[in-house]
Amino acid sequence: MAGGTIWKGYIHFADTDVAVKLHAAVKAERIQFHLLHKRDHVKLHQQMICAYEKIPVPTEAQTKGFEVEEGKYIIVDPDELEQTAPESSRMIEVHEFVKTGQIDPIFLDRVYYLEPDLHSEGYSELVGALQEMGAEGICTWTMRNRSYLGALQASGKILRLNTLRYADEVISVKSLELQESPVSEKELKIGSDLINQLTTPFQPQKFENEHEKKLQKLIEKKARGEKIALLRPRLLKPTASDKLLQALEESLKKVA
């Protein structure tokens, strides 16, 4: 079930405006721990402490600064920051279209659902057109005093809005030091056969957050007063290059 409406606006392209409501498409339900005083288990609160005077600094006495060198800052006042804020808008501006699948996944960030608002005209037509053309709309919009870049996508009968990272936020693979190692035809064949044996339609419901489940069980045991046995983590070692072929063959036998 989609979350509550977090933004309302219009999709604008050419001379068309489609009224929509924005909903979160994913939820981040994680077990959260509070920081407590170890002595009496009372919840702790954070304070902003002056590094020089060692005393708490109230909010009204705080300001923001950009460090240009160690210990030297350019002070930026709230009014000055306000001037850089994007102009408030209720428009998702579609600038161009690209073929579906053309966007490298490294640029994909958070995904939202777009629901038609006020029996919006043109919504179904836009969904159908994107599917017919196999296209996604590259768009920009403003939300919560931030500017966003995104991809407008059709999925079934709905529209999705996937925020995109800007190009300067993505680290180039050229920064990595990659060492090429020779691969024999036999290793390549066995590796390909192994992948083929394990290939299946994606079923996300098959996979669960094992760490989250273990945390939940730990909390339940502690709540019942059970003693927790401490286990040492199992250390894994990478497969030696001279044993890679043997390991691949054994893996292939297990799934065959």
Swiss-Prot record:
UniProt keyword list: DNA damage, DNA recombination, DNA repair, DNA-binding
A GO term, aspect molecular function: double-stranded DNA binding
A Pfam family it matches: Ku
Keyword DNA damage: yes
Residue stretches making up the Ku domain: 13-184
GO biological process, alphabetically ordered: DNA recombination; double-strand break repair via nonhomologous end joining
InterPro entries: Ku70/Ku80_beta-barrel_dom, Prok_Ku, SPOC-like_C_dom_sf
Assembly and binders: Homodimer. Interacts with LigD.
Record-stated family: Belongs to the prokaryotic Ku family.
Function per UniProt: With LigD forms a non-homologous end joining (NHEJ) DNA repair enzyme, which repairs dsDNA breaks with reduced fidelity. Binds linear dsDNA with 5'- and 3'- overhangs but not closed circular dsDNA nor ssDNA. Recruits and stimulates the ligase activity of LigD.
Name this polypeptide is given: Non-homologous end joining protein Ku 2
Organism field: Geotalea uraniireducens (strain Rf4)
